């Protein structure tokens, strides 16, 4: 539903006009944009990712020579952790406070958007708790909440279009190239309206994911106890 509404408003440009009617289908004015090489609604602009949200962090791996850098409470996110997950609650590896603090500028607060930029480009997900990533990932730390879902789907569209043109998205994209991606940017009012509609949908996915992970953990904790007879299942 969130993706469908994004496509309707920001791809087909049939967001509600002043009369509540679909903008483009109702004859809304479209203007050519040189940066995007296509028409966009009058009043919209083309903006780079760095102009929309300027806090972009490229991940880094702390020194593997010091084992004390790993195995703690800080999730160390890689592409495999993001793949298939809109929200990343847990990573395969973690960092200790020592390891994470050794590169303190790489901390990502909850809600930051991680985007793979080396190898398979365009794998994306939001961190659901304090985290850091490896160097294959660029992340956006949001200063404006209303940019979150819009940025996620806009980048998805960008990478899908790039794949359609080249046949694949296997390449490398450095921080500057990622920050320089242009997207069609609407009014703040429209962004806020979209954010208010889709946020509950994203929150539901986040809550459900958390509950599933908790159930899996309970199962993993209980199974060994059942196997060695420390607990039993009451069939009554």
Model regions and ranges:
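Short, well-ordered loop/turn and helix-capping segments at boundaries between secondary-structure elements
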Residues: 11, 120, 143, 157-161, ...
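Non-catalytic DNA-recognition/assembly elements of restriction-modification systems
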Residues: 1-5, 27-60, 76, 184, ...
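Glycine-rich, mobile lid/loop segments that gate access to catalytic sites or pores
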Residues: 2, 6-13, 20-27
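DNA target-recognition domains and sequence-specific DNA-contacting regions of bacterial/archaeal
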Residues: 20-186
């Amino acid at each position: 539903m969130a993706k469908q509404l994004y496509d309707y408003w920001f791809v087909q440009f049939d967001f509600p006009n002043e009369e509540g009617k679909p903008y483009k289908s109702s004859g809304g004015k479209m203007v050519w944009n040189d940066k995007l090489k296509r028409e966009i609604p009058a009043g919209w602009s083309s903006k780079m990712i760095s102009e929309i949200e300027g806090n972009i962090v490229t991940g880094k791996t702390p020194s593997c020579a010091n084992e004390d850098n790993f195995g703690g409470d800080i999730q160390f996110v890689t592409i495999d952790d993001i793949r298939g997950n809109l929200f990343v609650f847990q990573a395969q590896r973690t960092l200790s406070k020592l390891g994470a603090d050794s590169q303190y500028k790489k901390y990502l607060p909850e809600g930051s958007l991680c985007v793979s930029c080396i190898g398979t480009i365009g794998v994306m997900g939001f961190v659901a708790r304090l985290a850091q990533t490896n160097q294959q990932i660029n992340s956006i730390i949001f200063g404006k909440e209303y940019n979150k879902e819009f940025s996620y789907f806009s980048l998805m569209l960008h990478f899908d279009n790039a794949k359609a043109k080249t046949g694949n998205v296997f390449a490398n994209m450095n921080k500057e190239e990622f920050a320089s991606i242009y997207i069609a940017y609407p009014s703040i009012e429209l962004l806020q309206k979209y954010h208010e509609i889709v946020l509950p949908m994203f929150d539901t996915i986040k809550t459900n994911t958390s509950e599933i992970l908790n159930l899996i953990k309970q199962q993993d904790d209980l199974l060994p106890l059942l196997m060695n007879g420390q607990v039993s299942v009451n069939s009554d």
